[in-house]
Amino acid sequence: MCKGLAALPHSCLERAKEIKIKLGILLQKPDSAVDLVIPYNEKPEKPAKAHKPSLEEVLQWRQSLDKLLQSNYGFASFKSFLKSEFSEENLEFWVACENYKKIKSPIKMAEKAKQIYEEFIQTEAPKEVNIDHFTKDITMKNLVEPSPHSFDLAQKRIYALMEKDSLPRFVRSEFYKELIN
């Protein structure tokens, strides 16, 4: 980080990160533009044991992120798409939260909570997800005594972000178009 930014208050740096992410969304290329910058395989990864979904099922994914995530094939396609955009951290966080809720042992739950926090929530985390300060603060307070619901608010925020941002981009992508053709 440059010395000028280091002198700014922490809240200013957080706000700058939020603005950077929002600007990134606004600066996305139009659908008709040709991707000449970073070539990538536009074919989705196909899960080894998943059956190819029917056209009707694939069309339902447009309407429901839940239906997409419940389908092994849809999940793998969505994950491949997010990887191609270097934005798979939201899905990885959501999955980590789902797995966290299944933990029964308080000791393992505390260990997993710490791991999720360090990987996705804390500032400058390797796969930091974009959540507001309020959500981050509530999540941190919930982790004082970890429970299966410690990450619920953050998970809901990330789910909403995927539903409003990632899902529409996926539906417009070549990944999805290949599935309906």
Swiss-Prot record:
Q: Name one GO biological process term.
A: negative regulation of vascular associated smooth muscle cell proliferation
Instruction: Spell out the GO cellular component terms annotated for this protein, sorted alphabetically and separated by semicolons.
Output: cytosol; intracellular membrane-bounded organelle; membrane
Question: What coarse category fits the chief subcellular location reported for this protein?
Answer: cytoplasm
Gene3D superfamilies, alphabetically? 1.10.196.10, Regulator of G-protein Signalling 4, domain 2
What keywords sit in the KW lines?
Cytoplasm, Membrane, Signal transduction inhibitor
Role this protein plays: Inhibits signal transduction by increasing the GTPase activity of G protein alpha subunits thereby driving them into their inactive GDP-bound form. Binds to G(i)-alpha and G(o)-alpha, but not to G(s)-alpha.
- This chain's protein is named Regulator of G-protein signaling 5
